[in-house]
Amino acid sequence: MKKILTTPIKAEDLQDIRVGDVIYLTGTLVTCRDVCHRRLIELKRPIPYDLNGKAIFHAGPIVRKNGDKWEMVSVGPTTSMRMESFEREFIEQTGVKLVVGKGGMGPLTEEGCQKFKALHVIFPAGCAVLAATQVEEIEEVHWTELGMPESLWVCRVKEFGPLIVSIDTHGNNLIAENKKLFAERRDPIVEEICEHVHYIK
């Protein structure tokens, strides 16, 4: 059975979810990347949309006008780690509960997710057109002066995913744990190879 989170998301909705789980999102998803984070945290400019209990997507979409409506053409994730220095404060100030992106995030986001009860989840790279099909409607757009990729596109989505949980509300970090595990497995293998093939060193 699919685990589907529906906005507005509450802290108790997240407490039983763990890293490695696969979930889906129904409700409000707002594209929000580098400049948006900088405006809020560095410039102290309030975001013109209430993100409390909502989800953001580290993404730079391609959209087109269809009559008087905007239509999502492609929306793939961008590298979440670029927002690492801002994400803890961003979660605290906005009350956002789901951060969607590509790749993992670091200890600051981990701390923010644990303290303020949020998740970081990974949307598979290379699936931007699939993601666009899961956007039912673009309901609003803000900060259009930033250009298409950096604008805040407020989307209504249905069963958006799959989303792999990389940081949960208990301080677990899937990517960090995997890096440690891979290093532990790699080192003895490299040492053994080096015994037989000396020029590798």
UniProtKB/Swiss-Prot annotation:
Lineage: superkingdom: Bacteria
Which residues are annotated as active site? H37
Q: What is its EC number?
A: 4.2.1.32
Keyword entries, A-Z: Lyase
The recorded induction information for this protein reads:
Induced by tartrate, via TtdR.
Q: Name one GO cellular component term.
A: catalytic complex
InterPro entries, sorted: Fe-S_hydro-lyase_TtdB-typ_cat, Fe-S_hydroAse_TtdB_cat_sf
What GO MF terms are annotated?
L(+)-tartrate dehydratase activity
Q: Which reaction does it catalyse?
A: (2R,3R)-tartrate = oxaloacetate + H2O
Q: Which residues cross the membrane?
A: none
Q: Which GO terms describe its biological process?
A: response to heat; tartrate catabolic process
Q: Could you say which protein family the record assigns here?
A: Belongs to the class-I fumarase family.
* Subunit and interaction comment: Heterotetramer of two alpha and two beta subunits.
Protein name in the entry:
L(+)-tartrate dehydratase subunit beta
- Give the species this sequence originates from: Escherichia coli (strain K12)
Gene name for this UniProt entry: ttdB
